[in-house]
Regions:
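Nuclease catalytic cores that cleave nucleic-acid phosphodiester bonds
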Residues: 2-144
Length: 144
């Protein structure tokens, strides 16, 4: 089992590494050339910039039983299909039960963008979001 991080814009790389170290789980950081993220104790794989290049590389590497950290619903859906556990940076674990609603939200947001309406951006990251992420990842690893 590995933890794979879709690291482009991911605010929990260091938290993930701390928790993974405690459980002795290897971490693979995947990023593009615009976001080269090197961390001691993790393998970093860097890919060319391009639409979804990191996402496709991650999907090609993920195996059943791996854990994936991403905020990309499409990537999460593909990883779930490969029997991985998937969570976002706020501690939400993606499941077959919540994926349909999340994908619908993504579709609606893309429709708004095409219509020239820009959805409100995310607020500043909070300590509570970090705590929720730590709790979810710890629970997943403790249950294995």
């Amino acid at each position: 089992m590995n933890i794979l991080i879709d690291a482009d814009g991911c605010p929990v790389v260091d938290l993930t590494l701390q928790i993974a170290k405690r459980f002795g789980v290897p971490v693979i950081i995947l990023c593009d050339t615009a976001h080269q993220i090197e961390r001691e104790g993790a393998q970093t794989l860097v890919f060319d910039k391009g639409a979804d290049s990191v996402d496709f590389a991650l999907v090609n590497r993920v195996k059943a039983g791996d854990i994936v950290v991403t905020q990309d619903y499409g990537l999460a859906s593909m990883c779930l299909a490969k029997c991985a556990r998937v969570l976002n940076q706020n501690g939400l674990e993606y499941t077959a039960d919540n994926m349909e609603a999340l994908m619908l939200r993504r579709y609606e947001n893309k429709k708004l963008l095409r219509a020239g309406k820009h959805p409100k951006g995310s607020p500043k990251r909070t300590k509570e979001q970090d705590e929720a992420f730590v709790a979810t990842l710890t629970d997943i690893l403790a249950s294995i």
